[in-house]
């Protein structure tokens, strides 16, 4: 079997969706070494290492043109290359699939990470919200199978799009093996010293932005004992200023630590 992947996020994204994409490709390449895995993506050096295996190949867009040509190829004109490489299944790893594949012999799978642009629309700019709504709705209506990464996402797909549960499979995201390697006491002490960490804290990792809802964590701090702190790690946005103001207003500023 030949499986194609929308590898854009695997190539250009260093955070959640990029990590998910790379781990899915790596896991399938090991579990099914007889299958060919074809990564359809831009002509760019990957920001993080892609899986390397004999059954993994990269497929590029036409050499002419730039970003516009790539997006047209990715979203509208991929069918020719899918036929060329004999792709049996095409997996859209981040809420979208190309148009027109329901008229081709290639079957399609799409992973839906969340519908937060519908559940929390105020956390997105209007243009991005409209783009995500259009692409995700199309993917859910036309994909042969939908993978939801959580029960909440599956429920939202059924609620907002009216998709039957028979078309949805809940497959939780994998965890990098590094998180199963216990840190030594010396390593813990070194990190605590480097970042001036308190003895007890809740760790919150993710871009510091409104839809991540770090606000709720800060609001909860007054309800627990004063020895408990919050350590918030992630890329800062202007939302961090709002969180710092909230921490001062709730008298927990000394217990909230930002690392970016």
PLM ranges: what are they?
Residues 1-260:
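Carbohydrate transferase catalytic cores enriched for Leloir-type hexosyltransferases
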């Amino acid at each position: 079997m030949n499986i194609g992947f929308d590898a854009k996020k695997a190539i250009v994204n260093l955070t959640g969706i990029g990590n998910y994409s790379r781990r899915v490709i790596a896991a399938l390449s090991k579990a099914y070494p007889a299958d060919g895995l074809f990564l359809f993506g831009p002509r760019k050096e990957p920001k993080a290492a892609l899986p390397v295996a004999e059954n993994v190949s990269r497929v590029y867009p036409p050499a002419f043109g730039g970003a516009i040509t790539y997006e047209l190829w990715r979203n509208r004109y991929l069918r020719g290359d899918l036929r060329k490489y004999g792709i049996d299944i095409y997996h859209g790893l981040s809420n979208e699939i190309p148009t027109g594949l329901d008229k081709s012999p290639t079957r399609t799978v799409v992973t839906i990470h969340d519908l937060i642009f519908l559940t929390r629309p105020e956390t997105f700019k209007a243009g991005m919200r409209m783009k995500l709504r259009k692409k995700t709705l199309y993917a859910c209506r036309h994909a042969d199978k939908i993978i939801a990464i959580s029960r909440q996402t599956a429920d939202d797909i059924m609620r907002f799009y009216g998709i039957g549960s028979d078309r949805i499979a809940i497959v939780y995201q994998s965890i990098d093996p590094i998180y199963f390697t216990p840190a030594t006491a010396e390593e813990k002490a070194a990190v605590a010293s480097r970042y001036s960490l308190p003895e007890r804290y809740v760790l919150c990792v993710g871009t510091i932005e409104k839809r991540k809802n770090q606000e709720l964590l800060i609001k909860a701090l007054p309800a627990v004992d004063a020895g408990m702190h919050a350590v918030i790690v992630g890329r800062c946005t202007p939302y961090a200023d709002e969180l710092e103001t909230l921490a001062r207003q709730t008298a927990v500023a000394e217990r909230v630590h930002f690392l970016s």
